[in-house]
Curated annotation (Swiss-Prot):
Protein name in the entry: Cytochrome b-c1 complex subunit 8-1, mitochondrial
Keywords: Electron transport, Membrane, Mitochondrion, Mitochondrion inner membrane, Respiratory chain, Transmembrane, Transmembrane helix, Transport, Ubiquinone
Family in the record: Belongs to the UQCRQ/QCR8 family.
InterPro entries the UniProt entry points to: Cyt_b-c1_8-plants, Cyt_bc1_su8_sf
Domain of life: Eukaryota
Source species of the chain: Arabidopsis thaliana
Transmembrane domains' residue ranges: 42-58
Summary of the function given for this chain in its UniProt record: Component of the ubiquinol-cytochrome c oxidoreductase, a multisubunit transmembrane complex that is part of the mitochondrial electron transport chain which drives oxidative phosphorylation.
Membrane topology, as annotated: Single-pass membrane protein
Mitochondrial intermembrane side: 59-72
C-alpha cells in the first residue's frame, strides 16, 4: 500500500518581448527609497566609513612624514 506518484504540472514563466514595463517597481520612488535607507542606517554607515577613512588618512600622513624625514 505505497503512495502513488502524482504528476505535477510545470509552471513556465516568460516575459513577453513586447512588454515594456518589466522592472518598473525597481525604479519607482527611488529617491524616497534611498532617503529611507540612508536615514535608517546612517549610524552604521558612519561607524563603517570612519575607521576606513581614518586608516587611509593616517597611512597617507605617515608616508608623507617618512618622505620628509629623509630630507634633512
Amino acid at each position: 500500500m505505497g503512495k502513488q506518484p502524482v504528476k505535477l504540472k510545470a509552471v513556465v514563466y516568460a516575459l513577453s518581448p513586447f512588454q515594456q514595463k518589466i522592472m518598473t517597481g525597481l525604479w519607482k520612488d527611488l529617491p524616497e527609497k534611498i532617503h529611507h535607507k540612508v536615514s535608517e542606517n546612517w549610524i552604521s554607515a558612519t561607524l563603517l566609513v570612519t575607521p576606513v577613512v581614518g586608516t587611509y588618512w593616517y597611512a597617507q600622513y605617515f608616508k608623507e612624514q617618512e618622505k620628509l624625514e629623509h630630507r634633512f
